[in-house]
Regions:
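Glycine- (often His-adjacent) and acidic-residue-rich active-site loop
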Residues: 34, 55-90, 106, 218
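Terminal peptide-recognition signature
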Residues: 17, 21, 36, 53, ...
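Conserved CoA-thioester-binding segment of acyl-CoA-metabolizing enzymes
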Residues: 1-56, 89
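Hydrophobic alpha-helical membrane-association signature
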Residues: 32-35, 80-83, 113, 185, ...
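Crotonase-fold acyl-CoA enzyme core
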Residues: 89-204, 231, 235-236, 241-244, ...
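Terminal low-complexity tails and localization/encapsulation signals of metabolic enzymes
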Residues: 1-3, 244-258
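Structural motif
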Residues: 14-18, 52-54, 73, 99-101, ...
Length: 258
């Protein structure tokens, strides 16, 4: 499928989805978000083993497009945020690990998009912000994903002050996994997505789904959820192949996909 504001490319087992509206600072307008969600759905239904989310241009993403919201009625605003929620949920719903490749600024819904990815690598010049606290519309929905990455106090500091944080701080707070020199960003992303995608694709997909199902439950309910999933997953052919290959001291051959 061809998109207007998104590029997709597959190299070996990895699909790269690239925000490609640099003249608008990759603002997440309604049509852009629909395309991003569609691109992730397509990648998720493929036999790819990993997905990279990247961006072209001077920033990763400037967040929501104010042009969509200025003068909008309540129904239009609700539609905009429903589409946004669907896009964020789709990133986490696909079975493959998703790695954000972050350069320059990721702000507001752009920061939310990074937080929604399973993993993230940032160049050392990257920065992150929830600037609504300095303006007229608080970053209500970006806080949903960001707070789940960095906790209440740090998320509220970002949102209430509107101040950006640098890449090293983002890593210390848990918003990104690691920070590398800008020149090493592509290599670091390639390495991480390859390592995150190895093993049984079915097992990895079930593992990702199970993580998001249990992570916000209380501990007892989380163990019940994870225990049932792990029990049923142990019955799959790939799980049995993993057990047998270990016992037989040979390389496993996995054949199942989500």
């Amino acid at each position: 499928m061809t998109y207007q504001h998104v590029l997709t490319d597959r190299c070996d087992d990895v699909v790269t989805i690239t925000l490609d509206r640099p003249e608008k600072r990759n603002a997440l307008a309604l049509d852009v978000m629909l395309e991003v969600a569609a691109a992730f759905e397509a990648a998720g239904s493929s036999d790819a083993l990993g997905v990279v989310l990247a961006a072209n241009g001077p920033v990763f993403s400037a967040g929501h497009n104010f042009g969509d919201m200025a003068g909008a009625d309540l129904d239009a605003a609700r539609e905009l945020f429903e589409v946004c929620h669907n896009m964020m949920d789709t990133v986490q719903a696909i079975p493959q690990p998703v790695v954000a490749r972050v350069h320059a600024l990721a702000t507001a819904a752009g920061c939310q998009l990074v937080a929604s990815c399973d993993l993230a690598v940032a160049g050392e010049s990257a920065s992150f912000a929830l600037p609504g606290g300095k303006g007229g519309l608080f970053c209500h929905t970006p806080l949903v994903a960001v707070a789940r990455n960095i906790g209440r106090k740090r998320a509220l500091e970002l949102a209430l002050t509107g101040d950006p944080i640098d890449a090293r701080t983002a890593a210390d707070w848990g918003l990104v996994n690691r920070v590398v020199a800008d020149a090493e960003l592509d290599a670091a992303v390639t390495d991480l997505v390859a390592r995150a995608g190895r093993g049984s694709a079915l097992s990895k997909g079930l593992g990702k789904r199970g993580f998001y199902e249990q992570i916000d439950l209380d501990q007892s309910a989380a163990y019940e959820c994870a225990g049932e999933l792990m029990s049923t997953a142990a019955m799959t052919d790939d799980a049995q192949e993993g057990f047998n290959s270990f016992l037989e001291k040979r390389r496993a051959v996995f054949t199942q996909y989500p």
